[in-house]
Each structure stands twice: as C-alpha cells, then as structure tokens.
Amino acid sequence: MKEAVKMSCLCIFVFLFLFSLTDAIKCIKCGESGLFGTEDCVTGTFEAEECGPNDQYCTKIILNDGTRTTAQRGCSVGHVPESNQKDGKVSTHMSSCNTDGCNAN
C-alpha cells in the first residue's frame, strides 16, 4: 500500500513538472507604442513572440477613424469577446484567440 501511495505521488509530481515546462502562447505584438495602435501594425509582417507565463490569449484591436486605420496586437490574460462596432465614421474590431500567432490576420 505504501508503495502505491509513493508511486501515485511520484506520478503527480512528474505530471506537474512536465506541465510547468509547456511553452507560453506566442502572439503577434505590435502597435503597443501608440495610444490607439499604429498603422504599420495593420499590414506589417511580424513574427509571433512568446507572451508572459499567465497570458492565455492573443488579442487584436483595429480602429478606423475614417481617414486612417491603426491596429494593436498583443497578449492577454483574459478572453476578449469578438466585437465590431461603428459610430459614424469610426469603426472598431476587437477579438482574441488562443493558438500561437492567431492574431496575425
């Protein structure tokens, strides 16, 4: 019985150790320097970068004010429900996803 308990504890420890080695999600990160994103983040080509250990989602926010379009892409701890809003000439798109590089398009 003692051996079974020891083996169970060992299995749990190994599982937790291997789980901690999993890679963090990788997201496209751009447009974070501008308050409303940047224009190059809309169509630029970027490599996905590793996010923080608590981040589980990639996010994308696109803003069009009628004259220019800007975007901001990055990492998030929480899910952002997809939304498309338009108010006069201003339109916004927000979304999140949870696979590597999924916020590229």
UniProtKB/Swiss-Prot annotation:
Compartmental location: Secreted
Processing after translation: Contains 4 disulfide bonds.
Cellular component annotations (GO), alphabetically ordered: extracellular region
Ranges of compositional bias, category Polar residues: 92-105
Keyword Secreted part of the UniProt annotation: yes
Alphabetical list of Pfam families matching this protein: Toxin_TOLIP
Record keywords, A-Z: Disulfide bond, Secreted, Signal, Toxin
InterPro entries for the chain: Snake_toxin-like_sf, Toxin/TOLIP
Note: The scoloptoxin-05 family has remarkable similarities with the three-finger toxin family commonly found in snakes.
Family designation: Belongs to the scoloptoxin-05 family.
Protein name, as recorded: U-scoloptoxin(05)-Ssd1a
Lineage, opening ranks: Eukaryota, Metazoa, Ecdysozoa, Arthropoda, Myriapoda
